[in-house]
Structure formats: C-alpha cells, structure tokens
Amino acid sequence: RQISGTILTRELKQHTSIKDVASDSGYFVKTYRELVEQVAKLSYLNKDYLLFFRGQANDYKNKAGKSTFYPTIYRSDYLTQQELDYRFDKLYSASKILAELFKKHKVEGQTELRRKKHIQWSILQHYEVTETPLIDVTQSIRVACSFAQLKNDQNTAFVYIFGLPYYTNRISINSEHDLINIRLLSITPPQALRPYFQEGFLVGTDDITNEYERK
C-alpha cells in the first residue's frame, strides 16, 4: 500500500493548508478537550504516521516567517563557525565524561552507552547538560502542554504536532526521510526517571555536521 500524504482536519483546512502551515498563525483552541479532539482526528486521518508533540511558550520564526525547530547546538541569531566548532567540542567532551561516569558508577547500560553517540547525546540533551543536534518531543499531549506553559507569563502557548514515521527500534534511522528517532524510555537506565514521566523521544537528522553552511 502506498504511503499517503498528510491530511488536515476539516477545521484546520479552514484555517490553513499543508503548504502554508509553517507560515500561518497557529490554530487556536480554548480548552484541553478541543486540543485532544483535533489530535484524535489527525491521528485517525494520518494512519501512516505516528504523532509526536512539542510544547513551547513562543513560536520562533525564521526570516521567511516560517516556524523553525533548530536543535540547541545550531540555535543563534548569528552563529559563527568558531562558535559552532566550540559547541561540538563541548558536546564531545561532555559525552566522554558521561561515558566515564557511567563506567565508574557501574550504571546499567554503560557498555552500550560508550559505543553509541546517540545514546550519549540523548541523555545530555534531555537533562539539558549541553547543546546537542537533537530535539525533544513527546508522545504525551499533557507533557507538551506542561512545557508550553512552563515559565510562560503570556496568555497563549504553542503545542506543535509532528507526523513522523513509525519507529521500529530503540534508535530508528529512516534513510528516506534522513531522520533519527530515539526512544528515551528504551535507552536510559532505570535510575533516570524523567524520560518515563515525560514519555520522551529525541529526533534529529542522520547527517549531523559542524559545517556552518549546512547547518
């Protein structure tokens, strides 16, 4: 069966289109129930995709006026090559220290963590240790709403819905979409409870680079 394209709900079609969704203003809902209803409809209409959520206090636009979702390592109004190199050096140093600490304290999963950089980066990103090339998302609407309202003194908040390919492993690499999807619940040791409370996932591209022109 051919994979279908993204389908919007009737209400969303009256507000925007697939082509313009990134540049249009968000679809306003007044209640949590309204949000859940839209999510339920989107999930039903888009069976070929798994829905993930991200909550933010603000909608960050690029120069073209479109919503953007940059990993922390690439975020800056003006990011120089020198700063980017520094951030990657800091990431590699933090990864090495994390692996050493796991080994020292005999944390479960230490052997695999030392071998796989994406596991190292996922833990560093989720616990906000340093900038990484990954973005936090969740399968919980409630968690996304909580993050959208965290330290938010405005009257509005933003919850984004992403339709991503179904994951097949703990670390799923989709070469067709150049996408990595990491299920935190499956890679973090049981001592790390935050991913279980937040139903956390990390997503990024397989082609991770510190080349400024390609960021």
Model-derived segments and their meaning:
Residues 1-215:
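Catalytic-core elements of nucleic-acid end-processing and repair enzymes
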